[in-house]
Amino acid sequence: MCAGSACEEITPMRHRYVFSLLLFTIPIAAAGQAKSPMALFPGIELEWKDGPPALPKGAKMAILEGDPTQPGVFTMRLRFPDGFQVFPHWHTQTEHATVIKGTLHLGMGERFERSSTTALVTGSFGYWPAGTKHFAWAEGETILQLHGQGPWTITYVNAADDPRTARP
């Protein structure tokens, strides 16, 4: 036996309303799932290649998602040897960085000054907006994960620091 609103009779109109909602929401949920394929990259299976030409020699990279040279989402890892340096530069998109291994010393500004950097140790995360002038150096072998919107570009503050234009 019921009492009050807990025993309201479910009318045919209410059935149609609930059924219509289900018919509308199930395809939307399924479509969202279809656009999100899963990808796993166990660390030992990454394919490391020479780093992008915009970085000094010695850098290695592994692309996890997308294509950093094209518009759209990308995720890549960069591996730097001990003492690796990237001189002051900026990007056209916001940069998101996570230190996977080692220590990345990051500084802001137009002059490379080791003493004015912040040590980002394993597990550190940071992001900075497009146009932010910054520089970095690695202490120990360092692996950095970058993700964001492509194309990923680097413009050096001092054109002479750009490895793409450096003379042998």
Enumerate the predicted regions with their spans.
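Short, Lys/Arg-enriched N-terminal segments with co-localized hydrophobic residues
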Residues: 1-12
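Bacterial N-terminal signal peptides that target proteins for export
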Residues: 11-19
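Hydrophobic h-region of N-terminal signal peptides that target proteins for export
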Residues: 23-31
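A short, N-terminal "cap"/entry segment at the start of jelly-roll beta-barrel domains
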Residues: 32-74, 117-118, 159-168
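Short beta-strand His + acidic residue motifs that chelate non-heme Fe in jelly-roll/DSBH
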Residues: 86-88, 106-107, 128-129, 133-139
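Short acidic-glycine-tyrosine-enriched beta hairpin
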Residues: 110-131
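Ligand-binding loop in jelly-roll beta-barrel domains
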Residues: 119, 130-153
